[in-house]
């Protein structure tokens, strides 16, 4: 078994763990399988994990979209990284391809009504890329389980935090908060306490990615730079549409 494939699935499990635990997306209780795989990433478990990801009706279409444009598989390490953190693969996806994905994959019972999907597909902001921040800020939530209010958009967005204090079950981080001010989205600096999540070995002044106030993974400075870049790129694009 290719170690890169296992590493990719571990990363995918980390980013989808908390939203599934909250029952917002994916097969009910997939998070328990994800946690088990993160802690014991054995090759014989990979097929089941891959199948579970296919049940994520918002996430998996983006992975397929990015993969197809770059001639890779949906759960390739670079594809998973592109969607959650951001990398050069995103620039290979055309707006037309994103439009086709919205109409083909998001129009179904329990997701978007056709009228809303058409409206979204026809008005994709120029300069946007199919990063998780695009889904949060422009598509909002295809599931009716989550109300598209600012607090939820902020929580769902993958943010970052510089660790200032390590506690028993939480981390105090200097992070950012999504706000809506003067008719546009902005990121505002905010110190907050988050669940230490699945992160071990956290140290003061290291960086973590954050999803639903839950620490996802420790990230390097280049990952931090990419996450900021693609998040801010989509904020700028969506603001031009508002």
Residue map of PLM features:
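N-terminal low-complexity, intrinsically disordered tails enriched in Ser/Pro/Gly
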Residues: 1-73
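Generic detector of well-ordered alpha-helical segments enriched in charged/polar residues
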Residues: 7-10, 32-35, 39, 50, ...
